[in-house]
A protein has these predicted regions:
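Flexible, charged surface loops at secondary-structure boundaries
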Residues: 11-12, 61-64, 148-152
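A short, well-structured juxtamembrane/interface segment
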Residues: 53-58, 138, 144-145
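Catalytic metal-binding/acid-base residues of hydrolase active sites
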Residues: 24, 74, 97, 162-163
């Protein structure tokens, strides 16, 4: 689980974003039932992930926050729930804060797409064997989503690694 602070100037504001990666998920039940694609997004946190989320409120960065915004994906939503309960921060759920999109199914294809994404610095080459969301598309999706919160000074955003890394180092 990671935390990182970013000041966004792109929204005509100096909004501070505290990025939080969701806790560790437990995919076992979904894998046993052969779920794929967005079905895997139903995975809850593992015991370790719940513990990570419950301890997160102690991070001093969170003390300056005014709002908690989360991806609608279960592992992020469950992480945000624990933080909201512990801090009393109001919680908003945003479907546009979802995981990076790969337009083909299967874990092997996902890993191949991630490798291509990193090798090509977030660009999608015209001859790419796999179609995926580019870094520019992810940034645009995030900024569009967060524009409605521009009046908040500091916002905690619980989301996913590939989206976070467009704004903070991995």
């Amino acid at each position: 689980m990671a935390c990182g602070l970013v000041v966004l100037g792109q929204l005509d504001t100096k909004m501070k974003i505290i990025f939080v990666r969701h806790g560790e998920p437990d995919y076992r039940e979904l894998e046993e039932r052969s779920y794929t694609g967005f079905g895997m997004d139903l995975a809850p946190l593992s015991e370790k992930g719940r513990q990570q989320a419950q301890e997160l409120w102690q991070n001093p960065l969170l003390q300056s926050a005014n709002l908690l915004v989360t991806s609608a994906v279960t592992r992020a939503l469950e992480t945000a729930f624990y933080v909201s309960c512990a801090t009393g921060l109001p919680l908003r759920v945003e479907p546009l804060l979802h995981e990076w999109q790969v337009y083909e199914s299967g874990i092997d294809r996902f890993e191949e797409a991630r490798t291509l994404f990193l090798e090509n610095k977030g660009e999608l080459l015209s001859n790419s064997p796999i179609q995926y969301e580019t870094a520019t598309e992810m940034k645009s999706r995030f900024l569009e989503c967060m524009a409605k919160y521009r009046d908040y000074q500091t916002v905690v955003v619980v989301t996913h690694r590939m989206l976070m890394r467009q704004f903070v180092p991995d």
